[in-house]
């Protein structure tokens, strides 16, 4: 890697010097761009076309020089690169069945197939049980082809050319690099040690790729451990030596490794070794899973495989993948293909931080927008501190003495602020008492009324201390039986009327999820009638009807009582005999909200108040139209006027959507008093010029002298017209 980086750096510095010589060097981006073109194997013509914008007339001179340098580099690297083959040429070639078949001509053919400047192949490797793929896993030469910015290629091999003269047993040992992470879940050798008396074939999964270790008895393993260390040291020293032996060595190893998959060898192994995996399909599934995890290359030590003593004819490896089913648990794996480098310079690549930031923000937004639970809206009302009074204690004693009935009052929960310890203790005792006893609904209603009465009185005081109130739960309303006595019905109606405040106060639960809180501090000022919703108003005016639990509980703390309602409520509570009748309540309701007037809204159909308008909006068509005498004041629908706002007819029976501008009728002209008529013809007529002449002046005929009617009664002036000849013009004679 260091040699390739050094070559790339030298090429880049040479390009930079050449650009400075030509006077075209501006910054570091142009040499980087040229290095990218070199990495992409651009031809001289393509480079000339791309660099003409930057170099101008010196483009051809520069590209000729650059390609000359690259050709020299290729000629220098041809000799070392011919010593080894690329991954495709080495491992995709058919493996011969005999060692003698691999001749020097084949070696020369492999050398010729290696390009001088090679890029790692991005073709997906095959994952089958072929010997060629098996040899790719534990190959003799660890070809590391590094192309740094496309400048040069360094073909580096770590070779194990040594052969043992006669090793007692064979070891294929592929070990991960020391900085690789070891998958502890798949390390079967250390977690499942087998008996030392019996040699076992164990499949060990490392971090980057699966490897095979054929374990021997402990004696032979200890003897060979030092040999492995020596070979690993010798491997680092042999980088470019013994090139001629590499292909022969590799072919021999491939040949011997291929024999491991032959049926005769497998049968003998099954007799001698106990396989760790009995189920071959399970082993292959684990190989596939581990193949997806491979990312990094490994440092492998390759030792010649000992020949098994078989006199039978050696067979070529079968191409079918299914031929390995039922065989011993040997691993055939493919090294991970090199990671593809982007061709763009780092300055033009996408910023990974932006992508990661966008992903994290998207995840945060998803987690924030989900899991919202509905929390009732809270309102802060001024409440004076209250203490338990003698009346409240008396009511509690009455509740204790009540006989139990089948009706159960729902439990009421209350938590007061920590500062008001007296209120908390007393309220808790009372609520527990109500929840334990089966209370008669009338008594529970009376108790609730008395408690709420003090709430109301404390609200009347101008105390600005605020407690956060919450909408009551559905279980806090008490159903009133229709056959109770009139005093209790009045109390229930008052409870419904004042249902905005007469709910149990609750402290805000700290464990509830956060939600928008609208805290409004009302310093003893009741809300105006306009702020009440329609449902609340309807609730106020239908207070005489028995209220079911759900409808009453939905009202909640939506507003405050009107002053008139507070006065009415205090009168009812002060009346011990309950003589305050329902009739007075209904009178109050009617007085508060007048019914709709039986008068048509003058803004209809463009009225903005809609159903809230106090005037009548027509719905059904008028049956008397167009003879309806009410015109625009009719309570039924009339058709639209085609003139709409431009209509000037004051009593137009049609409907006008736009507002008409009232047209003032012109003031009638006062006719002058008629002079006394006289049948005597004015003597000065038609030349009379007196406007108030009392005499008769005949009316002129509009056709004047051209009138042809002999019986025309109008006046025709008698004008003496000159004769015809007098109207003829003659040119005067001029004397010559």
Swiss-Prot record:
How is the quaternary structure described?
A: Homodimer; facilitating circular RNAs (circRNAs) formation. Associates with the spliceosome. Interacts with HOOK2. Interacts with ZFC3H1 in a RNase-sensitive manner.
Domain of life according to the entry: Eukaryota
**Which segments carry the region annotation Disordered?**
78-146, 310-350, 398-430
Q: Which SMART domains match?
A: ZnF_C3H1
Zinc fingers, C3H1-type class: 595-620, 621-640, 641-656, 682-699, 701-719
Looking at the UniProt record for this protein, which Gene Ontology cellular component terms does it annotate, in alphabetical order?
Answer: cytoplasm; nuclear speck; nucleus
Which Gene3D superfamilies does this UniProt record tie to the protein?
4.10.1000.30, 4.10.1000.40, PWI domain (1.20.1390.10)
Query: N-acetylmethionine occurs at which residues?
Result: 1
Which residue positions does N6-acetyllysine occur at? 357
Q: Which PROSITE patterns match?
A: ZF_C3H1
Q: Which GO terms describe its molecular function?
A: poly(A) binding; pre-mRNA binding; zinc ion binding
Q: Which family does it belong to?
A: Belongs to the ZC3H14 family.
Q: Please explain the role this protein plays, according to its UniProt record.
A: RNA-binding protein involved in the biogenesis of circular RNAs (circRNAs), which are produced by back-splicing circularization of pre-mRNAs. Acts by binding to both exon-intron boundary and 3'-UTR of pre-mRNAs to promote circRNA biogenesis through dimerization and the association with the spliceosome. Required for spermatogenesis via involvement in circRNA biogenesis. Regulates the pre-mRNA processing of ATP5MC1; preventing its degradation. Also binds the poly(A) tail of mRNAs; controlling poly(A) length in neuronal cells.
Where are the Phosphoserine residues found in this chain? 85, 240, 281, 327, 343, 390, 409, 421, 498, 515, 527, 620
The name this protein carries in UniProt is Zinc finger CCCH domain-containing protein 14
Listed Pfam families: zf-CCCH_2 (PF14608)
* Compartments in which it is found: Nucleus speckle
Organism field: Macaca fascicularis
Which residue numbers mark the cross-link Glycyl lysine isopeptide (Lys-Gly) (interchain with G-Cter in SUMO2) in this sequence? 99, 139, 175, 198, 245, 283, 295, 357, 378, 413, 489
Which keywords does the record carry? Acetylation, Differentiation, Isopeptide bond, Metal-binding, Nucleus, Phosphoprotein, Repeat, RNA-binding, Spermatogenesis, Ubl conjugation, Zinc, Zinc-finger
Q: Which PANTHER family match?
A: ZINC FINGER CCCH DOMAIN-CONTAINING PROTEIN 14
Q: Which Gene Ontology BP terms does the record give?
A: mRNA stabilization; spermatogenesis
Tell me if Metal-binding is a UniProt keyword of this record.
Answer: yes
């Amino acid at each position: 890697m260091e040699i390739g980086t050094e070559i790339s750096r030298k090429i880049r510095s040479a390009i930079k010097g050449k650009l400075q010589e030509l006077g075209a060097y501006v910054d570091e981006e142009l040499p980087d761009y040229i290095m990218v073109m070199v990495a992409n194997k651009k031809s001289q013509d393509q480079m000339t076309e791309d660099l003409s914008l930057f170099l101008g007339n010196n483009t051809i001179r520069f590209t000729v020089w650059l390609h000359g340098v690259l050709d020299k580099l290729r000629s220098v690297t041809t000799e070392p690169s011919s010593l080894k083959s690329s991954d495709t040429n080495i491992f995709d070639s058919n493996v011969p069945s005999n060692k003698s078949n691999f001749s020097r001509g084949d070696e020369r053919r492999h050398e010729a197939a290696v390009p001088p400047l090679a890029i790692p192949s991005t073709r997906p490797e095959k994952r089958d049980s072929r010997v060629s793929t098996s040899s790719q896993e534990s190959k003799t030469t660890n070809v590391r082809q590094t192309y740094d910015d496309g400048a040069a290629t360094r073909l580096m091999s770590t070779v194990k050319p040594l052969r043992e003269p006669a090793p007692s047993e064979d070891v294929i040992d592929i070990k991960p690099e020391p900085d690789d992470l070891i998958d502890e879940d798949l390390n079967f050798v250390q977690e499942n040690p087998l008996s030392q008396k019996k040699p076992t074939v164990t499949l060990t999964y490392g971090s980057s790729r699966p490897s095979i270790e054929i374990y021997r008895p402990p004696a032979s393993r200890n003897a060979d451990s030092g040999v492995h260390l020596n070979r690993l040291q010798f491997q680092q020293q042999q980088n470019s030596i013994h090139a001629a032996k590499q292909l022969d060595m590799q072919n021999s190893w491939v040949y011997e490794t291929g024999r491991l998959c032959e049926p005769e060898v497998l049968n003998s192994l099954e007799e001698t070794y106990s396989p760790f995996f009995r189920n071959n399909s399970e082993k292959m599934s684990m190989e596939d899973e581990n193949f997806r995890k491979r990312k990094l290359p490994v440092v492998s030590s390759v030792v010649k495989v000992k020949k098994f003593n078989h006199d039978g004819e050696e067979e070529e490896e079968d191409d079918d993948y299914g031929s390995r089913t039922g065989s011993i648990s040997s691993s055939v794996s493919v090294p991970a293909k090199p990671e593809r480098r982007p061709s763009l310079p780092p300055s033009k690549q996408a910023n990974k931080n932006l992508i990661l930031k966008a992903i994290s923000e998207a995840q945060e937004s998803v987690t924030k927008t989900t899991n919202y639970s509905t929390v009732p809206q809270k309102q802060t009302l001024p409440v004076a501190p209250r203490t338990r009074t003698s009346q409240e204690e008396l009511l509690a004693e009455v509740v204790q003495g009540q006989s139990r009935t089948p009706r159960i009052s729902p439990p009421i929960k209350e938590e007061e602020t920590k500062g008001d310890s007296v209120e908390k203790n007393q309220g808790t005792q009372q609520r527990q008492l109500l929840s334990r006893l089966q209370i008669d609904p009338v008594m529970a209603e009376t108790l609730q009324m008395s408690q709420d009465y003090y709430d109301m009185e404390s609200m009347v005081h101008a105390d600005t201390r605020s407690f956060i109130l919450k909408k009551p739960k559905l279980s806090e309303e008490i159903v009133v039986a229709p056959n109770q006595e009139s005093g209790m019905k009045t109390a229930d109606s008052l409870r419904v009327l004042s249902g905005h405040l007469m709910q149990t106060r609750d402290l805000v639960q700290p464990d509830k999820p956060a939600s928008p809180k609208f805290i409004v501090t009302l310093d003893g000022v009741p809300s105006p009638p306009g702020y009440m919703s329609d449902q609340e108003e309807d609730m106020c005016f239908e207070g005489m009807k028995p209220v079911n639990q759900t409808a009453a509980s939905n009202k909640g703390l939506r507003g405050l009582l009107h002053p008139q309602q507070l006065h009415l409520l205090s009168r009812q509570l002060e009346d011990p005999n309950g003589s305050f009748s329902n009739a007075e309540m209904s009178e109050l309701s009617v007085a508060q909200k007048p019914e709709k007037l039986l008068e048509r809204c003058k803004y209809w159909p463009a009225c903005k108040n809609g159903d809230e308008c106090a005037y009548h909006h027509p719905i059904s068509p008028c049956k008397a139209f167009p003879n309806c005498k009410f015109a625009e004041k009719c309570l039924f629908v009339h058709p639209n006027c085609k003139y709409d706002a431009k209509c000037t007819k004051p009593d137009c029976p049609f409907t006008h959507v736009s507002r008409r501008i009232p047209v003032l009728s012109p003031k009638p002209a006062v006719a002058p008093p008629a002079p006394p008529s006289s049948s005597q013809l004015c003597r000065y007529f038609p030349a009379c010029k007196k406007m108030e002449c009392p005499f008769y002046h005949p009316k002129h005929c509009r056709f004047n002298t051209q009138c042809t009617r002999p019986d025309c009664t109008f006046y025709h002036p008698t004008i003496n017209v000159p004769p015809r000849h007098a109207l003829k013009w003659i040119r005067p004679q001029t004397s010559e």
